[in-house]
Amino acid sequence: MDLGTANTIIIKDDKIVLDEPSVAAFDNRTGEMIAVGTKAREMYEKGNANIRTIRPLREGVIADFDAAEHMIRGMIRMISRRRGWFTPSLRMVVCIPSGSTEVEIRAVRDSSEHAGGRDVYMIYEPMAAAIGVGIDVLAPEGHMIVDIGGGTTEIAVISLGGIVEDQSIDTAGDELTQDIMDHMREKHQIKVGERTAEQIKIQVGAVYADIDDAPADFTVWGANMMDTMPRKVEVNYREIAECLDNSIGKIESAILRTLEATPPELYADIVANGVVLTGGGALLRGLDKRLSKRFGLDFKIAENPLHSVAIGTGIALKNIHNFNFLFR
Protein backbone atom coordinates (compact mmCIF):
# COMPACT_ATOMS: atom_id res chain seq x y z
CA MET A 1 0.00 0.00 0.00
CA ASP A 2 1.25 3.43 -1.01
CA LEU A 3 -0.51 5.50 1.64
CA GLY A 4 -0.02 8.93 0.12
CA THR A 5 -1.11 12.41 1.07
CA ALA A 6 -2.93 12.85 -2.25
CA ASN A 7 -3.73 9.27 -3.30
CA THR A 8 -3.71 5.78 -1.85
CA ILE A 9 -2.68 2.96 -4.16
CA ILE A 10 -3.02 -0.73 -3.32
CA ILE A 11 -1.25 -3.48 -5.24
CA LYS A 12 -1.95 -7.20 -4.97
CA ASP A 13 -0.25 -9.91 -7.02
CA ASP A 14 1.58 -7.32 -9.15
CA LYS A 15 -1.66 -5.57 -10.13
CA ILE A 16 -2.98 -2.19 -9.06
CA VAL A 17 -6.35 -3.01 -7.52
CA LEU A 18 -7.09 0.45 -6.12
CA ASP A 19 -5.98 4.00 -6.90
CA GLU A 20 -8.15 6.51 -5.06
CA PRO A 21 -7.81 9.99 -3.54
CA SER A 22 -6.82 9.90 0.15
CA VAL A 23 -10.06 11.52 1.29
CA ALA A 24 -12.84 10.37 3.61
CA ALA A 25 -16.26 11.94 4.24
CA PHE A 26 -18.13 11.68 7.55
CA ASP A 27 -21.66 12.41 8.72
CA ASN A 28 -21.26 14.89 11.59
CA ARG A 29 -24.56 13.77 13.13
CA THR A 30 -23.60 10.11 13.50
CA GLY A 31 -19.81 10.16 13.12
CA GLU A 32 -20.06 7.45 10.47
CA MET A 33 -17.94 7.46 7.33
CA ILE A 34 -20.25 7.91 4.34
CA ALA A 35 -17.74 7.96 1.47
CA VAL A 36 -14.11 7.28 0.73
CA GLY A 37 -11.81 7.93 -2.21
CA THR A 38 -13.26 9.49 -5.36
CA LYS A 39 -16.77 9.88 -3.95
CA ALA A 40 -15.41 11.69 -0.90
CA ARG A 41 -13.11 13.79 -3.10
CA GLU A 42 -16.16 15.00 -5.06
CA MET A 43 -17.57 16.32 -1.77
CA TYR A 44 -14.31 18.02 -0.76
CA GLU A 45 -14.74 21.78 -0.22
CA LYS A 46 -18.42 21.38 -1.15
CA GLY A 47 -19.90 20.04 2.08
CA ASN A 48 -22.55 21.42 4.41
CA ALA A 49 -22.81 21.49 8.19
CA ASN A 50 -23.76 17.81 8.27
CA ILE A 51 -20.92 16.50 6.09
CA ARG A 52 -17.23 16.72 6.92
CA THR A 53 -14.55 15.77 4.39
CA ILE A 54 -11.05 15.00 5.66
CA ARG A 55 -7.67 14.35 4.12
CA PRO A 56 -6.22 12.16 6.91
CA LEU A 57 -2.61 12.60 5.77
CA ARG A 58 -0.68 15.84 5.65
CA GLU A 59 2.93 16.24 4.58
CA GLY A 60 3.20 12.50 4.11
CA VAL A 61 2.18 11.48 7.63
CA ILE A 62 -1.08 10.74 9.41
CA ALA A 63 -2.66 13.90 10.76
CA ASP A 64 -5.97 12.31 11.82
CA PHE A 65 -5.53 8.79 13.19
CA ASP A 66 -9.24 7.88 13.39
CA ALA A 67 -10.00 9.16 9.88
CA ALA A 68 -6.95 7.35 8.47
CA GLU A 69 -8.06 4.06 10.02
CA HIS A 70 -11.58 4.46 8.62
CA MET A 71 -10.21 5.39 5.20
CA ILE A 72 -7.85 2.40 4.98
CA ARG A 73 -10.58 0.05 6.17
CA GLY A 74 -13.03 1.53 3.65
CA MET A 75 -10.59 1.14 0.77
CA ILE A 76 -9.80 -2.47 1.67
CA ARG A 77 -13.54 -3.15 1.89
CA MET A 78 -14.02 -1.47 -1.50
CA ILE A 79 -11.63 -3.82 -3.31
CA SER A 80 -12.88 -6.82 -1.33
CA ARG A 81 -16.40 -6.17 -2.63
CA ARG A 82 -15.18 -5.63 -6.20
CA ARG A 83 -13.17 -8.83 -6.33
CA GLY A 84 -15.01 -11.09 -3.92
CA TRP A 85 -12.12 -11.33 -1.49
CA PHE A 86 -12.52 -12.54 2.06
CA THR A 87 -9.95 -10.58 4.07
CA PRO A 88 -10.11 -11.36 7.80
CA SER A 89 -6.42 -10.47 8.06
CA LEU A 90 -3.80 -9.25 5.64
CA ARG A 91 -0.04 -9.20 5.26
CA MET A 92 0.80 -5.65 4.26
CA VAL A 93 3.78 -3.52 3.28
CA VAL A 94 3.11 0.20 3.72
CA CYS A 95 5.42 3.01 2.60
CA ILE A 96 6.34 5.95 4.77
CA PRO A 97 8.48 9.08 4.27
CA SER A 98 12.15 8.56 5.04
CA GLY A 99 12.03 11.38 7.59
CA SER A 100 9.22 9.85 9.67
CA THR A 101 9.52 9.95 13.45
CA GLU A 102 8.84 6.95 15.70
CA VAL A 103 5.46 8.45 16.60
CA GLU A 104 4.53 8.87 12.93
CA ILE A 105 5.66 5.32 12.10
CA ARG A 106 3.59 3.96 14.97
CA ALA A 107 0.53 5.86 13.74
CA VAL A 108 0.80 4.24 10.29
CA ARG A 109 1.37 0.79 11.80
CA ASP A 110 -1.53 1.09 14.25
CA SER A 111 -3.93 2.42 11.59
CA SER A 112 -3.01 -0.43 9.23
CA GLU A 113 -3.38 -3.07 11.94
CA HIS A 114 -6.73 -1.71 13.12
CA ALA A 115 -7.92 -1.73 9.51
CA GLY A 116 -7.19 -5.47 9.16
CA GLY A 117 -3.44 -5.83 8.77
CA ARG A 118 -2.19 -8.99 10.48
CA ASP A 119 1.48 -8.66 9.48
CA VAL A 120 2.40 -5.03 8.76
CA TYR A 121 5.83 -4.11 7.41
CA MET A 122 7.16 -0.64 6.61
CA ILE A 123 9.34 0.53 3.74
CA TYR A 124 10.72 4.00 3.14
CA GLU A 125 9.23 5.68 0.08
CA PRO A 126 12.46 6.34 -1.86
CA MET A 127 13.49 2.70 -1.41
CA ALA A 128 10.09 1.56 -2.71
CA ALA A 129 10.36 4.00 -5.62
CA ALA A 130 13.82 2.68 -6.54
CA ILE A 131 12.55 -0.90 -6.54
CA GLY A 132 9.51 0.16 -8.55
CA VAL A 133 11.60 1.67 -11.36
CA GLY A 134 13.70 -1.48 -11.66
CA ILE A 135 16.81 -0.51 -9.71
CA ASP A 136 18.70 -3.37 -8.05
CA VAL A 137 18.79 -1.79 -4.59
CA LEU A 138 20.95 -4.60 -3.18
CA ALA A 139 23.79 -3.98 -5.64
CA PRO A 140 27.03 -2.25 -4.55
CA GLU A 141 26.23 0.73 -6.74
CA GLY A 142 24.89 4.20 -6.05
CA HIS A 143 21.50 5.29 -7.36
CA MET A 144 19.62 8.51 -6.69
CA ILE A 145 15.84 8.91 -6.50
CA VAL A 146 13.81 12.13 -6.29
CA ASP A 147 10.20 11.30 -5.42
CA ILE A 148 7.89 14.35 -5.48
CA GLY A 149 4.63 13.27 -3.89
CA GLY A 150 1.63 15.16 -2.58
CA GLY A 151 2.89 15.87 0.92
CA THR A 152 6.65 15.34 0.79
CA THR A 153 9.57 15.28 -1.60
CA GLU A 154 11.88 12.36 -0.85
CA ILE A 155 15.46 12.49 -2.10
CA ALA A 156 17.73 9.52 -1.47
CA VAL A 157 20.99 7.91 -2.49
CA ILE A 158 20.67 4.12 -2.29
CA SER A 159 23.32 1.39 -2.27
CA LEU A 160 23.65 -2.16 -0.86
CA GLY A 161 20.05 -2.30 0.33
CA GLY A 162 20.24 0.88 2.37
CA ILE A 163 19.66 4.61 2.17
CA VAL A 164 23.09 6.26 2.35
CA GLU A 165 21.96 9.90 2.26
CA ASP A 166 18.47 11.35 2.19
CA GLN A 167 16.38 14.47 2.53
CA SER A 168 12.64 14.56 3.23
CA ILE A 169 11.02 17.98 2.83
CA ASP A 170 7.41 19.13 2.87
CA THR A 171 7.76 21.15 -0.32
CA ALA A 172 5.77 18.93 -2.67
CA GLY A 173 2.50 18.72 -4.60
CA ASP A 174 0.31 20.32 -1.93
CA GLU A 175 2.61 23.32 -1.59
CA LEU A 176 2.74 23.74 -5.37
CA THR A 177 -1.07 23.71 -5.43
CA GLN A 178 -1.12 26.39 -2.73
CA ASP A 179 1.36 28.43 -4.80
CA ILE A 180 -1.11 28.38 -7.69
CA MET A 181 -4.03 29.38 -5.45
CA ASP A 182 -1.98 32.31 -4.12
CA HIS A 183 -0.93 33.29 -7.64
CA MET A 184 -4.52 33.37 -8.91
CA ARG A 185 -5.53 35.55 -5.99
CA GLU A 186 -2.59 37.95 -6.22
CA LYS A 187 -2.22 38.30 -10.00
CA HIS A 188 -5.74 37.74 -11.29
CA GLN A 189 -7.75 38.72 -8.18
CA ILE A 190 -9.89 35.60 -8.27
CA LYS A 191 -10.40 32.89 -5.69
CA VAL A 192 -9.95 29.29 -6.76
CA GLY A 193 -10.22 26.18 -4.61
CA GLU A 194 -7.80 23.32 -4.23
CA ARG A 195 -9.43 21.17 -6.91
CA THR A 196 -9.31 23.98 -9.49
CA ALA A 197 -5.68 24.72 -8.63
CA GLU A 198 -4.92 21.01 -9.13
CA GLN A 199 -6.50 21.18 -12.57
CA ILE A 200 -4.37 24.21 -13.45
CA LYS A 201 -1.28 22.27 -12.34
CA ILE A 202 -2.23 19.30 -14.50
CA GLN A 203 -3.22 21.30 -17.58
CA VAL A 204 -0.49 23.98 -17.68
CA GLY A 205 1.87 23.08 -14.83
CA ALA A 206 5.49 23.77 -15.77
CA VAL A 207 8.77 24.76 -14.12
CA TYR A 208 10.76 25.80 -17.17
CA ALA A 209 9.96 28.48 -19.74
CA ASP A 210 11.64 26.70 -22.67
CA ILE A 211 9.75 23.44 -23.13
CA ASP A 212 8.76 21.29 -26.09
CA ASP A 213 5.06 20.79 -26.86
CA ALA A 214 3.86 23.76 -24.83
CA PRO A 215 0.27 23.25 -23.61
CA ALA A 216 -2.59 25.50 -24.70
CA ASP A 217 -3.75 28.15 -22.26
CA PHE A 218 -6.24 26.91 -19.68
CA THR A 219 -9.52 28.72 -18.98
CA VAL A 220 -10.36 29.25 -15.32
CA TRP A 221 -13.55 30.68 -13.84
CA GLY A 222 -13.52 32.17 -10.36
CA ALA A 223 -15.13 34.77 -8.15
CA ASN A 224 -13.72 38.26 -8.61
CA MET A 225 -12.37 39.28 -5.20
CA MET A 226 -13.47 42.89 -5.73
CA ASP A 227 -17.17 42.37 -6.46
CA THR A 228 -17.72 38.54 -6.32
CA MET A 229 -18.84 38.59 -9.97
CA PRO A 230 -17.76 35.57 -12.06
CA ARG A 231 -14.56 36.18 -13.96
CA LYS A 232 -12.83 34.20 -16.69
CA VAL A 233 -9.03 34.05 -16.82
CA GLU A 234 -6.73 32.43 -19.38
CA VAL A 235 -3.74 30.87 -17.61
CA ASN A 236 -0.55 29.96 -19.47
CA TYR A 237 2.31 27.65 -18.56
CA ARG A 238 4.92 30.42 -18.35
CA GLU A 239 3.15 32.23 -15.51
CA ILE A 240 2.74 28.93 -13.65
CA ALA A 241 6.46 28.22 -14.09
CA GLU A 242 7.15 31.62 -12.56
CA CYS A 243 4.81 31.13 -9.62
CA LEU A 244 6.28 27.69 -8.82
CA ASP A 245 9.89 28.86 -9.10
CA ASN A 246 10.45 29.47 -5.38
CA SER A 247 9.15 26.06 -4.32
CA ILE A 248 11.12 24.24 -7.02
CA GLY A 249 14.15 26.13 -5.73
CA LYS A 250 13.59 24.53 -2.31
CA ILE A 251 13.59 21.08 -3.93
CA GLU A 252 16.80 21.97 -5.76
CA SER A 253 18.39 22.99 -2.46
CA ALA A 254 17.48 19.64 -0.91
CA ILE A 255 18.95 17.81 -3.91
CA LEU A 256 22.14 19.86 -3.53
CA ARG A 257 22.42 19.00 0.19
CA THR A 258 22.04 15.31 -0.63
CA LEU A 259 24.68 15.42 -3.36
CA GLU A 260 27.10 17.34 -1.14
CA ALA A 261 26.84 14.62 1.52
CA THR A 262 27.20 11.72 -0.94
CA PRO A 263 30.50 9.78 -0.77
CA PRO A 264 32.72 10.28 -3.86
CA GLU A 265 32.44 6.72 -5.20
CA LEU A 266 28.65 6.79 -5.00
CA TYR A 267 28.60 10.24 -6.59
CA ALA A 268 30.55 8.79 -9.53
CA ASP A 269 27.89 6.08 -9.86
CA ILE A 270 25.16 8.75 -9.93
CA VAL A 271 27.01 10.60 -12.69
CA ALA A 272 27.00 7.35 -14.69
CA ASN A 273 23.46 6.23 -13.83
CA GLY A 274 21.64 9.54 -13.70
CA VAL A 275 18.84 10.50 -11.31
CA VAL A 276 15.30 9.10 -11.52
CA LEU A 277 12.29 11.37 -10.94
CA THR A 278 9.10 9.77 -9.61
CA GLY A 279 5.82 10.89 -8.07
CA GLY A 280 3.19 13.20 -9.50
CA GLY A 281 5.55 16.16 -9.35
CA ALA A 282 7.83 14.44 -11.88
CA LEU A 283 5.17 15.20 -14.50
CA LEU A 284 5.62 18.96 -14.22
CA ARG A 285 6.65 20.11 -17.67
CA GLY A 286 10.35 20.88 -17.99
CA LEU A 287 11.38 19.57 -14.55
CA ASP A 288 13.85 17.02 -15.90
CA LYS A 289 15.35 19.65 -18.22
CA ARG A 290 15.64 22.26 -15.47
CA LEU A 291 17.29 19.90 -12.98
CA SER A 292 19.66 18.45 -15.58
CA LYS A 293 20.83 21.95 -16.45
CA ARG A 294 21.12 22.96 -12.78
CA PHE A 295 23.21 19.98 -11.62
CA GLY A 296 24.92 18.73 -14.78
CA LEU A 297 23.43 15.27 -14.23
CA ASP A 298 20.99 13.24 -16.31
CA PHE A 299 17.60 13.59 -14.62
CA LYS A 300 15.04 11.27 -16.20
CA ILE A 301 11.35 10.71 -15.53
CA ALA A 302 10.37 7.19 -14.47
CA GLU A 303 8.29 5.19 -16.94
CA ASN A 304 5.34 5.16 -14.53
CA PRO A 305 6.03 7.97 -12.04
CA LEU A 306 2.60 7.96 -10.41
CA HIS A 307 2.80 4.28 -9.50
CA SER A 308 6.54 3.68 -8.98
CA VAL A 309 6.29 3.66 -5.18
CA ALA A 310 3.27 1.35 -5.17
CA ILE A 311 4.88 -1.05 -7.65
CA GLY A 312 8.01 -1.19 -5.49
CA THR A 313 5.91 -1.84 -2.41
CA GLY A 314 4.23 -4.77 -4.18
CA ILE A 315 7.61 -6.24 -5.12
CA ALA A 316 8.79 -5.80 -1.52
CA LEU A 317 5.74 -7.73 -0.28
CA LYS A 318 6.85 -10.72 -2.36
CA ASN A 319 10.42 -10.44 -1.05
CA ILE A 320 9.86 -9.88 2.65
CA HIS A 321 12.44 -12.50 3.60
CA ASN A 322 15.06 -11.16 1.16
CA PHE A 323 14.74 -7.44 1.88
CA ASN A 324 16.16 -6.85 5.35
CA PHE A 325 15.50 -3.11 5.04
CA LEU A 326 11.79 -3.77 5.66
CA PHE A 327 10.82 -3.25 9.28
CA ARG A 328 7.83 -3.52 11.58
Residue ranges of model-derived segments:
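Nucleotide/phosphate-binding catalytic cleft detector across ATP-hydrolyzing
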Residues: M1-I148, A156-V276, A282-R328
